[in-house]
Each structure stands twice: as C-alpha cells, then as structure tokens.
Amino acid sequence: MYNLSKKNKKLLIIFLVVFISISSLSLISTEYYFMSPGPPYQWDIEYESIDNYEFEGNLYQLTVRRDEANALIYAWSYVSNSVDLYPREVILPKGVSPEELSQISIQNMKTSENVAIAVALKYLGYDITSKGEGVSVVGILDDSPVKDALKRGDLLNSINNDEISSVSEFIAMLRTYDIGDTVKIGLIRDVDGSLKNLEIQTKLIEHVEYEGEPMVGFLATTANERFDFPFEIDIKTGNVGGPSAGLMMALNVYNNLIPNDITNSLVIAGTGTIEIDGSVGPVGGVKQKVIAAKRAGAELILVPTANFEEAKPMETDSTNIVAIDSFEEALKVISEYSSR
C-alpha cells in the first residue's frame, strides 16, 4: 500500500477542495446568459443543375457560443476578455422557453439562408421573387413598449400603412426611422377564433444589442416565406442558428458560381445580417467573432459598419478589419484586398 507524505497529503486535499468547489459552481445556475467565441464555418453547399466551382481560399462565417451561464462561467467572465454576460431577459423574453428560442434561432438561420441565396443570384443577374405572409410575433421583451399591446401569434403586415410581408422587409423599413420615432403598426390577431385587423402605435427604442439601431422589442419570424429560385441550392448549416451568417453565405454562394475565385487563396472571415436589397446589418457578439477570426488566421475580417467601432481596436498588423454596408461593398473590399 502506498503511503503519502505529509506534503503530498496537503496537495491532495487542496486539489480535492478546488475540484469540489469548481464542480459545485458548475451546478449553480444564474440569471445570465454568456457569449464566447464559437468555431468559424466554411459552409458546405450543394448545387443542383448548375455549374459550380471550388475555391482555394476561405470565406469563414464567424459564430458565437451562447447559453445559460452557471456560476463557474459567471466567475470566469470576470477574468476572461472573450466571455461576456447578458441578463437573461435580454436574450430570453418572458414566456419563451430556451427550446423555443433555439427553434426561433434555427428558423431565422433558414430565412437568412434563403435571403443570402437570393442576394447572390440577383447580383449574378437572375430574377428572384420572394413572398411571405407577414411578420409573426413569437416573443416579446419585458422592457418593450409594446409588451401590453402585442401578443404572441400576432401577424404584422404594415408600418405606417406601408405593407410588409417578411422580417427582412420589416427590418429594412425600421432602419428608415430613428430611435424615438412613433410608428403605426398594422396587424392581424386571432380573437376567439375570428381574425381581426388591428392597429397599434409605439415609439421605437434602441436595440438591446446593436447601438444606434431602432427596434420595437419582440422576437419574430416570417410567416410562410417562399422563394422562387431557378435551381436548388442547399447550404448545410447544421445546428447553427441566428441571422448573422447572411453576408458570408451570400459571398460563398456567389464565389461558387463564378469561375474566378474572389479570395485569391486568402483567409477571409466575416459576419453580418443581409436583407433582400443586399444591405448588411449589425450583429451581436462581434468581439467574440473577431477573436475567433484571429484564431483561425484570418487576414481580412468584414464587419457591419454598425459594429466597426467595437471591432477596430482588435485589428493587428496581420489582420485587417473593414466596415461594410452592403454585399456589393463586401465584394469590392475583397477584390481590392486580394489583388494587392
């Protein structure tokens, strides 16, 4: 039988105390969500009935890991520059379960995928049509000015009498207004089995994640959105959710459908939502995404203009961070950078 020395016994006791303490912290829940760098993705895309081309470089989509923070992660966030905390109600509206939030995120990714494909094909000269049946309310933030006026299941169809048929159109229209503006929202609500046309008025507030960006304050999906594509394109997104991959999905599709590789074998990474008009919008977790890009060896990082001030200080001699507002501008930046 092996006998421990007094010194080794003390070390063993210290180790056990630390191990038990850390294990205990991991079992304690908090009222926060955390965000940390996720893996960069180079999308696997399948095409049917159309010539496509592989490319030598990388067009990485940047991701974050977002989940409920236990006490261990909560403590770790105070010593790590790559982990941020958010109050639970900012991420998870009242009445929405984590499982529902995950499904909403996956659905938003699917919508983003279709919009990205549409943007890339339009730029290549294809005539693309899309149509949804309105903006479906799936959750309402506690601090939203419409928390008593909107209900889950409401179907929004206009802003100030201008029709909207999708979340993409809704966001694009909101960006034509300023924070503090009052807007009139038209909607359809199921009242005791009967559909009623209603209107509400609300002031736009600042987005909880994107500084300077107006919002109403609810989670949404597009009801029955349909795209008419000339051929089938399937982006293998797996379990990645959210709308922030739009820009990079559009760039990947575009680069696969032209014979000349826009990357020129460079490692390029980026993030940004994309709307049907090609405009690029802000994202959350840009700090974590830039960290992930640098870890992947990215030479050029594309970020939405709205996120540029946060991202710019992280630039190094070997990594250039560039602000972009549109798909077309992203192509121009990549072309200029890859031709150096």
Where are these regions (language model features)?
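Glycine- and Gly-Pro-enriched alpha-helical subdomains that act as flexible
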Residues: 256, 268, 276-301
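PDZ-domain C-terminal substructure recognizer with occasional recognition of PDZ-binding tails
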Residues: 124, 171-218, 313-329, 333-339
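Second-shell loop/turn segments in exported
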Residues: 100-111, 142, 157-160, 233-243, ...
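Terminal peptide-recognition signature
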Residues: 121, 146, 153-156, 160, ...
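Hydrophobic membrane-insertion alpha-helices, especially the h-region
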Residues: 10-29
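C-terminal, low-ordered peptide segments at domain boundaries
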Residues: 190-252
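Extracytoplasmic/periplasmic/luminal assembly and interaction segments
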Residues: 53-103
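PDZ/PDZ-like domain segments forming the peptide/carboxylate-binding groove
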Residues: 111, 117-158, 162-167, 279-284, ...
